[in-house]
Amino acid sequence: MAHHNGPRKKTRYKFKKDLRKRGIPPVTSVIQSFEIGQRVHVVVEPSVQKGMPHRRFHGKTGTVIGQRGRAWLLEVRDGDSVKQVIARPQHLKAQKV
């Protein structure tokens, strides 16, 4: 039988974009930067596969704790535990204050 357990399984509707928002994201989403301690939302950009966090963290809010190359290191609560997530800036949105 075929292998059905890829990293994007069960994401048919979760990662779907609106009709008018399809295509590559603007450059401003790539060059955005964050402060350490800043709160950010994990919103997966399905057209960019590099640096994509696990589907479990889509829609969660975390705190920036560092940077790893072009990606950002986040602390995200997952149930009772706190997990570290590495994601590129295309998949992050700053929380409005």
Curated annotation (Swiss-Prot):
Q: Does the keyword Ribosomal protein apply?
A: yes
* Record Gene3D superfamilies: Ribosomal protein L21
Q: Does the keyword Transmembrane apply?
A: no
Spell out the InterPro entries in the cross-references.
Ribosomal_eL21, Ribosomal_eL21_arc, Ribosomal_eL21_CS, Ribosomal_eL21_sf, Translation_prot_SH3-like_sf
What are this entry's molecular-function GO terms? structural constituent of ribosome
One Pfam family for this entry, by name? Ribosomal_L21e
**GO cellular component terms, A-Z:** ribonucleoprotein complex; ribosome
Keywords attached to this Swiss-Prot or TrEMBL record, sorted alphabetically, are: Ribonucleoprotein, Ribosomal protein
Q: Name one GO biological process term.
A: translation
Judging by the UniProt lineage, the source's domain of life is Archaea
User: Record's PANTHER family?
Assistant: 60S RIBOSOMAL PROTEIN L21
Family stated for the protein in its record: Belongs to the eukaryotic ribosomal protein eL21 family.
**Name of the protein described by the UniProt record:** Large ribosomal subunit protein eL21
Write down the species: Methanoculleus marisnigri (strain ATCC 35101 / DSM 1498 / JR1)
**Source species taxonomy:** Archaea, Methanobacteriati, Methanobacteriota, Stenosarchaea group, Methanomicrobia
Gene that this polypeptide is encoded by: rpl21e
